[in-house]
Design a protein with these regions (language model features):
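A recurrent flexible, glycine/aromatic-enriched loop bordering the glycosyltransferase active site
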Residues: 153-173
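Short beta-strand-to-loop acidic/aromatic patch adjacent to the donor-nucleotide binding site
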Residues: 82-91
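Short, well-formed alpha-helical segments that are part of the catalytic scaffolds
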Residues: 14-27
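A conserved acidic beta->alpha catalytic loop
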Residues: 24, 39-48, 92
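Conserved donor NDP-sugar-binding/catalytic core segment of glycosyltransferases
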Residues: 97-136
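Short beta-strand/loop segment that forms part of the nucleotide-sugar
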Residues: 33-41, 59-61
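A short, conserved alpha-helix in the catalytic core of glycosyltransferases
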Residues: 166, 171, 177-182, 187-198
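Glycine-rich, basic loop-to-helix element that forms the pyrophosphate-binding segment
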Residues: 61-80
Length: 198
């Protein structure tokens, strides 16, 4: 049986980013079962553009902030019985093999697998530096190297799976995990939703 994947994108007034994101999603090696865009009441032509995209589902709602958009999209994923939700910021451009690699890496032991987010021009530079973890999976505090900011150094010093995620930046989350922990707290309008959910 093939697992079903909902690619969820939340957007607000960033049409040029969104167009590019959708193009990358539509050209994945592993077919996405459905793409859902939650439009937080954009007024830059986003809704009109999305109405021309017949293969993309759209929920237009008042601007409830990013957490409100994620909350709405996750509710949709739960209601429609997807196996996974692939969380994608509208300025994310996943590599062609991203979804295939995430799905192939997922096991019952995982609740979420996240890609690293790379600088588009400097491919070795991590957009979000990753904290160095000690043997107890806690961030290292007393060290010259407390965060990895280059992909090559991160790969050299870490395992295949690392107990850290950049949620909403290409993370694949299982619906079974969402059913256990619940949906995102939609009261975080702009910041804090990722930290709270992680």
């Amino acid at each position: 049986m093939t697992e079903t994947v909902l690619a969820l994108v939340v957007t607000y007034n960033r049409l040029n980013y969104l167009k590019r994101c959708l193009e990358f999603l539509e050209n994945q090696d592993r077919k996405i079962n459905q793409i859902l865009v939650v439009n937080n009441d954009s007024n830059d032509g986003t809704q009109q553009y999305l109405e021309t995209k017949k293969n993309i589902n759209v929920i237009k709602q008042e601007n409830l902030g990013s957490a409100g958009g994620w909350h709405t999209g996750i509710e949709y994923g739960l209601k429609n019985n997807f196996d996974y939700i692939w969380m994608m910021d509208d300025d994310g451009y996943p590599d062609k093999s991203s979804l295939k690699n995430l799905i192939n890496s997922f096991t019952e032991a995982h609740s979420c697998i996240s890609s690293v987010v790379l600088n588009e021009k400097l491919k070795n530079l991590l957009v979000f530096p990753i904290p160095k973890l000690n043997k107890y999976n806690n961030p290292v505090i007393f060290s010259l190297l407390r965060k990895y900011n280059q992909l090559s150094i991160f790969k050299k010093n870490s395992m295949e799976f690392y107990n850290y995620a950049n949620l909403f930046n290409g993370s694949l989350i299982s619906i079974r995990s969402i059913k256990k922990i619940g949906n995102i707290n939609k009261n975080y309008i702009l910041y804090g939703d990722e930290v709270d959910y992680f």
